[in-house]
Amino acid sequence: MSVNLLAVTFDCADAANLAAFWGQVLEHPVDEGGTEEFAAIGLAGSAATRPCWMFLKVPEGKTAKNRVHPDLGAASLEAEVKRLVDLGATKQAEQDQDGVRWVTFLDPEGNEFDVVADPS
């Protein structure tokens, strides 16, 4: 038996708004029919677009640092930092460790994510 990663799921206060933000970040359209309760990116697509991103409204707010977070790669870290801040992300920190550079952000609901300078 084998498994594969089907989805990355975010608990959130407003699924449609957070999906719209991440759709812009990922440059992928939000699936039709998204609501404040549930929205997705790529769930309606083929398995080739997996993992999909899902957003599910929950009653409680975020109270602690994420134990898991997405890491995204960017050919131009500086340009991507500007683009993400313009989209509504909050820049938290810049790191350079053993020649690997990345920036940590918060999405509009406070979820951490990193953008790593793609070495290629």
Indicate where each model-derived feature is located.
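Core segments of cupin and vicinal oxygen chelate
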Residues: 2, 9-52, 80, 86, ...
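Amphipathic alpha-helical interaction segments
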Residues: 29-30, 61, 110-113
